[in-house]
Amino acid sequence: IPGDNTAMRSITAYVDSRGEVTLIGSARVLLEDHAPTMIGNPVAMITEDFPALWRDACALLTDNGYRGFANFDVKIDPRDGRALFFEVNPRIGRNNWYMAAAGANPMIPMVEDLIDVKACEQTQATDEILYTLVPDSLLLHYITDEDLRARVKRIIREGRRFDLLLNPTEKDLRRNLTVWLQKQNHRRKFAR
């Protein structure tokens, strides 16, 4: 299937013990890690609602009696716009923090279901945010679609950029140096 990383979508869901989807959210992948052992792992995404994909994912889960977290990898075929579901991982995704940053903490519906033993309304991650693990300049270098690039710049300018490694309250010099080196390592990896 042709298309760069931006044709990929990530969908995160939680199906409670009653069989109801109580958490749903999605993101457009902007850039994936290109290291051989990390291929397919997004390093930058924009949260975005994809109602048709949400319906399909929810139907797939509920029609098959699924329970728990699910993370879907979906690619949009640029030739005809069809969504192709590649896989469903029976766990929360590595990059699930995008859900909390977009307003839907994945732990809340799970705790309400399994600990509090109560039903909850469906939570949807609908706030538009940029989740990224790479420097902005590196990310923007790899986005070739000008409209998408402008959108990313706007989100950054509006302060809706989230990198879970960058915490302004962290004052430990060693930790901050490690994070800085990790960011530089991304530059090295993508330059190969």
Where are the regions a protein language model picked out?
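Oxyanion-binding "anion nests"
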Residues: 34-42, 46-74
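Predominant activation on well-ordered alpha-helical scaffold segments within soluble catalytic domains
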Residues: 12, 58, 107-111
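Feature representing long, continuous alpha-helical segments
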Residues: 55, 86, 105-109
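Peripheral (often C-terminal) accessory segments that flank ATP-dependent C-N-forming ligase machineries
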Residues: 108, 112-192
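Phosphate-binding site of ATP-dependent enzymes
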Residues: 1-35, 48-55, 76, 82-84
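Conserved metal-phosphate-binding beta-hairpin within the catalytic cores
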Residues: 61-97
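Short, conserved loop/turn and helix-capping segments at secondary-structure boundaries
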Residues: 47, 51, 100-105
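Glycine-rich phosphate/pyrophosphate-binding beta-alpha loops
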Residues: 30-42, 89-103
